[in-house]
Amino acid sequence: MKDLPAAMRPREKLLALGPAALADAELLALLLRTGLKGTGVLQLAGQLLAQFGGIGGLLQADPAGLKTVKGLGPAKRSELQAVLELARRAIVSQLAQRPVFDSPQAVRDYLRLQLGRLDHEVFAVLFLDAQHRLIAYEPLFRGTLTQTSVYPREVLKRALALNAAALILAHNHPSGVAEPSRADEFLTQSLKTALALIDVRVLDHFVVGRESVVSFAERGLL
């Protein structure tokens, strides 16, 4: 970056104009600090973003995925993972501090972070209080690439134990396609009926794919 004019260097640009003025690659370059022989740090940052599909994809990157990036040694990987984890925790904090339906995009982002990168199917529940604030996020069931077994009685037990007033269901499709199946619809209705017996509302069911998150409520499937 020394070859760049001072005003174009990410650090100087940030100090002069603020972080919002920097592109994603420039912000990432500040974290990486150095590039490789023949590859500048800005170019390395751009390659990293391209490999993972932008900042959103990078947030979902796991340690094994980061290990495949040439030029990311243990020190850089650990620093990058720390920043990514802080970003994930910020989203969790945002959900915990206010009613989740004040920010449906935050729910989507959170679920994508939790479930979008998994290669196995997981069924999870967000347990909410009467003001629809997050009490707990719990992955309750884990399955194969094609199916997972969900037991309504276990969901009811956790809802009662946590004194939840409402909940949001979520599961991922490791195939990458976030399209609800007939089995997903049947399960949702079964859980909704069972939970109504203990006066707990099902507010939504999200299906998480690699690139998108589908809401049952928005589809009219609740």
UniProtKB/Swiss-Prot annotation:
Pfam families: RadC, UPF0758_N. Zn(2+) binds at H171, H173, D184. GO terms for molecular function: metal ion binding; metallopeptidase activity. A motif (JAMM motif) lies at residues 171-184. GO terms for biological process: proteolysis. Keywords: Hydrolase, Metal-binding, Metalloprotease, Protease, Zinc. Residues 100-222 form the MPN domain. Belongs to the UPF0758 family. NCBIfam families: PRK00024.1, radc. This is UPF0758 protein Lcho_0695. It comes from Leptothrix cholodnii (strain ATCC 51168 / LMG 8142 / SP-6).
